[in-house]
């Protein structure tokens, strides 16, 4: 891992997690943290416009110790805080790195956003974008940077497909067409379906040491 300039703490891998409101971003972070926290040193930065609600949710769920979670109140458009002016998020990541000098990984969860949201490369080394089946099978073919450019696309809540009339086969075909050669995974996070594929992606693409 790289070091911060003249500092005694390393720079952790930073993974941006984006997606529309209700798609399952916070639920994904909760289950990821609980699953790999004994193997890696983890922290989380959450973004909300006027509150720190997502940070509180993760703390109440005991996903991580409270001092490993920072909630950023963006006070405006959540896109700006992860793209045009990521200074608040960058400061939060650095604060966590100072608190925990051997930090391996920081997740940066965006505020609820739309398909056009992207993370500044200064803020995120890798990006995961979460959509959910309940939004309808048309979502993958709508495109947008979240669909086409994210390093990993997570299509969540596959258990709801029969209830909303969505075809997972159609969604998979559209996803493969919209992001050729880029990975995607279908998940039901409540049952842990697809979780290991996400973890494998993080470890492999993030070049984290493999820990049994």
Curated annotation (Swiss-Prot):
Localization, UniProt: Cytoplasm
Protein name, entry field: Urease accessory protein UreG
GO BP, one annotated term: urea catabolic process
Alphabetical UniProt keywords: Chaperone, Cytoplasm, GTP-binding, Nickel insertion, Nucleotide-binding
Designated gene of the protein: ureG
Matches recorded under HAMAP family: UreG (MF_01389)
Molecular-function GO terms, alphabetical: GTP binding; GTPase activity; nickel cation binding
Function: Facilitates the functional incorporation of the urease nickel metallocenter. This process requires GTP hydrolysis, probably effectuated by UreG.
Family to which the UniProt record says this protein belongs: Belongs to the SIMIBI class G3E GTPase family. UreG subfamily.
Record bears the keyword Transport: no
């Amino acid at each position: 891992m790289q070091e911060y300039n003249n500092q005694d703490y390393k720079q952790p891998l930073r993974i941006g997690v984006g997606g529309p409101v209700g798609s399952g971003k916070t639920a994904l972070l909760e289950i990821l943290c609980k699953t790999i926290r004994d193997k890696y040193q983890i922290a989380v930065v959450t973004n909300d416009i006027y509150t720190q609600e997502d940070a509180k949710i993760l703390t109440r769920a005991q996903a991580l110790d409270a001092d490993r979670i920072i909630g950023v109140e963006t006070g405006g458009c959540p896109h700006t805080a992860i793209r045009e002016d990521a200074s608040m998020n960058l400061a939060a990541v650095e604060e966590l790195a100072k608190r925990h000098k051997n930090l391996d990984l920081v997740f940066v969860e965006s505020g609820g956003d739309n398909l056009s949201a992207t993370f500044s490369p200064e803020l995120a080394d890798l990006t995961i974008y979460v959509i959910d089946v309940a939004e309808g099978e048309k979502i993958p073919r709508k495109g947008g940077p979240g669909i086409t450019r994210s390093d990993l696309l997570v299509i969540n809540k596959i258990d709801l497909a029969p209830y909303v009339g969505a075809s997972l086969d159609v969604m998979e075909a559209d996803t493969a067409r919209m992001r050729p050669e880029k990975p995607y995974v279908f998940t039901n996070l409540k049952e842990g379906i697809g979780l290991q594929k996400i973890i494998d992606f993080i470890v492999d693409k993030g070049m984290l040491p493999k820990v049994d």
